[in-house]
Regions:
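Membrane-embedded helix bundles of polyisoprenyl
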Residues: 74, 79-92, 96-174
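Membrane-interface coil-to-helix junctions
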Residues: 1-81, 105, 109-127
Length: 174
């Protein structure tokens, strides 16, 4: 169902862009009878695709190549989670590259991470955002500019409200 939403979101985005460039009108289709027995597009896709910034790439991908992009993005989410965890470790002055690499691999390839990405790929977003939020908190505590924190809060908030709530709780506990 996530893949079908990914493909539909790409088609939906291309339709919006075509309308914008051909008629010079910004029109968001609101209802589609091909979703179940008919459903609101934005509400349905918000859970599956609209909140994930990486899913915007589906707009540029033809439907016949969507399976490749979907699989690649699933792996890329894990890669980004490992990078964000590694960045957090480097800022915390863990200078042993081998330790950080092993820690990042353990963080990414836990059973939770593998299960989530294979079943619900956008659930990997909190694994990306949490280390970045904590890194932003560390930068603010060190008196540096809060841009990383602000951008990460923005991305987490538009991605999924529930994830944002949980990330805010974990950040407050930190």
């Amino acid at each position: 169902q996530h893949f079908a939403a990914f493909v539909y979101f790409g088609k939906y985005g291309r339709e919006i862009l075509e309308t914008l460039f051909e008629t010079h009108k910004f029109v968001l289709p609101q209802w589609d009878f091909s979703i179940g027995l008919g459903s609101d597009i934005l509400t349905t896709l918000h859970f599956y695709a609209i909140g994930d910034p990486l899913d915007l790439l589906s707009i540029a991908c033809p439907a016949k190549y969507a399976a490749y992009l979907y699989s690649l993005l699933s792996l890329f989410r894990l890669y980004l989670a490992g990078l964000s965890f590694g960045a957090f470790c480097f800022i915390k002055k863990q200078n042993h590259v081998s330790s950080i690499t092993v820690g990042s691999l353990v963080y990414v390839f836990t059973l939770f991470g593998m299960f989530i990405v294979s079943h619900h790929p956008f659930f990997a977003l909190p694994m990306i955002f949490l280390p970045l939020l904590l890194l932003g908190v560390e930068q603010i505590a060190a008196g540096k500019r809060p841009y990383l924190f602000i951008v990460t809060v923005f991305l987490a908030a538009i991605s999924n409200f529930y994830f944002f709530y949980m990330l805010a709780l974990f950040t407050a506990i930190y």
